[in-house]
Amino acid sequence: MSQAKHVAVLKGGWSAEREVSLVSGKGCAEALRKHGYRVTEIDAGRDLADQILKVKPDVAFNALHGRWGEDGCVQGLLEILRVPYTHSGVLASALAMHKERAKFVFRAAGLPVAESVVVPREQAAHGHVMDPPYVIKPVSEGSSVGVFIVRAGDNRPPAELTSAEWNLGDEVMAERYIAGRELTCAVMGEEIFGVTEIIANTTFYDYEAKYQTGGSRHIIPAPIDADIYAEVQRVTLAAHKALGCRGVSRADFRFDDTRPGKPELILLEVNTQPGMTPTSLVPELANLAGYSYGELVSWMVEEASCDR
């Protein structure tokens, strides 16, 4: 272990993914304590800078999810405070969180993405913005918050788009729906992990399927052809590098094998702050590669830095 023994675990926050972050942060804090680190847990509020200055950590373990914690804001604050932190830096975090900007990078790198269009929420709420089926997503959210499938024959958009309670931004992305299977893969530094197939017990892999007990099954390694498996790994690492990610990231895919002789692999997004509960996807993949949960989070602390 390096001299960076006092770790501030940043969790909670005030995004739509607060509850997920609290669970991730708790798991990381417990594992780091077991590995000999002195840990202070910080439920991140708008006084986060004051909290960090008071605690004076050697490293910040960023277990925040969603806006402000995952989009470059907290990363920029930690750069200003000169506190080394885990995961990706300001630019990579901001790019990955904004689905449209991330696609610009992926296309430039020659990576496979689906056709999409970004429109005002009001426009999506009053008629089809592309031929169905398609998926409507907030431009800058994670954990499938605010994601809906619009299918052929649907006469009206999801009611949530016109709700006064909608707080997920004024623009949404409409993206061609990809039939088939849900795959995910992760990177740790320069090491590429295996591939997981996710089978949701709901219509699609939405927030409930991700976080409710029994909401989905994870098959590791994914039962797919070796060439597709290798391609998922290649694209995962290429996307990680194209965005300029550091530390750990996870790439999510759709694999359409429903048309004989015409398989299609599509990169959906890169998650720079993937879930870090002991049973989350990245810790499961790390375990497949021979790393315990504690070894994974310890590695992340030892790799923490500024100037990312």
Curated annotation (Swiss-Prot):
Keywords: ATP-binding, Cell shape, Cell wall biogenesis/degradation, Cytoplasm, Ligase, Magnesium, Manganese, Metal-binding, Nucleotide-binding, Peptidoglycan synthesis. Mg(2+) 2 binds at E269, N271. Pathway: Cell wall biogenesis; peptidoglycan biosynthesis. GO terms for biological process: cell wall organization; peptidoglycan biosynthetic process; regulation of cell shape. Its cofactor is Mg(2+); Mn(2+). GO terms for molecular function: ATP binding; D-alanine-D-alanine ligase activity; metal ion binding. Residues 103-302 form the ATP-grasp domain. SUPFAM superfamilies: Glutathione synthetase ATP-binding domain-like, PreATP-grasp domain. GO terms for cellular component: cytoplasm. Mg(2+) 1 binds at D252, E269. Its EC number is 6.3.2.4. It catalyses: 2 D-alanine + ATP = D-alanyl-D-alanine + ADP + phosphate + H(+). It is found in: Cytoplasm. It comes from the Bacteria. It holds the Pfam family Dala_Dala_lig_C. Binds 2 magnesium or manganese ions per subunit. Cell wall formation. Belongs to the D-alanine--D-alanine ligase family. This is D-alanine--D-alanine ligase. It comes from Parvibaculum lavamentivorans (strain DS-1 / DSM 13023 / NCIMB 13966). The lineage of its organism: Bacteria, Pseudomonadati, Pseudomonadota, Alphaproteobacteria, Hyphomicrobiales.
